[in-house]
Amino acid sequence: MRAASIALPLILVAAACASGQTPAAATTYRDATATHVPPAPELHALDAAFTDVDGDDDLDVVVAVEGGANRLYLNDGRGRLTWREGAFGTAAHDSEHVLAADFDRDGLLDVIFVAEDDMAHAFFLGAPGGRFVDATERLPARSEGNGLAVGDVNGDGLPDVVVGNSGSRAGRSGQNFLWLSDAARPGHFVDATAASLPAVDDDTQGVALADLDGDGDLDMVVANENPPNRLLLNDGRGRFTEHPERLDLRVPLETRQAHVFDATGDGAPDVLFLNLTSNAGRREKDPRMRLLVNDGRGAFRDESEARLPATTFSTWAGTPVDFDGDGDLDLVVGAIDVPGFRPMRVRAYENDGSGRYTDATDRVIPPETVGRSWGMAVGDLDGDGIEDIFIGGWGTQARLLLGSGGSR
């Protein structure tokens, strides 16, 4: 029986070659979308977060939806997702981002969404049985939100919230928000914006929290649609001060996301900006990714030309992930052709271990992953110990890429 099981693939390969067909080369990721993700080819799935909603020890998927109700996809333990309709209500909103954390300290993960045009941010408390209770009234304010980050910024052990605001419409402010968890009432928030953030009317699309200067607290990188991007240092108590002298911004950028991770392997976090040429309009700015390398003391120098391939597509989202299992962080990014807003194949860039990246798309990403790729989430969905990627889509099918032995 073993000999037969080995011989059959060889026969199939030989038959394919004899007929003039070349077998498709295997890629690091397998596109499991058709069998594992609920079909929704016109959905605007702008972001996703992985969290074990129902306590069965696998990762479920929470999806932020623009122009529809936010979604919950339950995992069967093998990465096959089923839509639990109405988990976050049925009202349509303009949700842009989603994150999960245990805000009320009950051991169950809660979910926060930020919304743009309708300013309908939403907050749901996790409940037993994989259910959620709407607690949106606990959020301190409404805004035209486009960025979201969660982390303990004041050292009290509770998750706090940063909302990045765009203020692109008349009468709306681009002042970003800082909401501190209320230690006296876990699951409630105190608006610390006025006392803790610079008073700046920005056009923020993304926010990242990380210890940039090595002092043990969470600092902030702000990604803006209109320049400049910003670096804010934390005083340890959750009060932030901008330090533009630490951020080497050599060209004007229209940035959608900031990622903070150790690209160069020196133990210090670096900053990656994912950029557009314009928001689906004409060609304006250089959309190539920018990698700013930490000098070890919290100052960041733009070394993009030496470390990243030149590209011309626009990128609304991406993620660092070790897809080749060598211990350093590679990159998977969405690509959209602008002008035109035309869908493109997802792209992959391999890290050589020192922060120099080469295009590995053909070896890593299945060719059918063409779409307007949006927010991504990374985690082991199918329980094989290997990280997978859920990729949102703007008016194209959200995708699930299952990792193989090379992606850990």
Each language-model region and where it sits:
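Blade-level signature of beta-propeller repeat domains, shared across WD40, Kelch, NHL, RCC1
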Residues: 375-408
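Blade-edge motifs of beta-propeller repeat domains
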Residues: 17-43, 74-93, 125-143, 179-202, ...
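Beta-strand-rich domains and repeat architectures in extracellular enzymes and scaffolds
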Residues: 36-66
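Acidic carboxylate motifs that coordinate Ca2+ or other divalent cations, activating on Asp/Glu
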Residues: 56, 60, 106, 110, ...
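Short glycine/acidic-enriched loop and turn motifs that connect beta-strands
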Residues: 68, 117-119, 167-170, 227, ...
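Beta-propeller blade termini
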Residues: 46-55, 96-105, 145-155, 205-214, ...
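Beta-rich catalytic cores
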Residues: 44, 68, 94-96, 144-149, ...
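Hydrophobic beta-strand segments that make up the repeating blades of beta-propeller
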Residues: 59-65, 111-115, 161-166, 220-224, ...
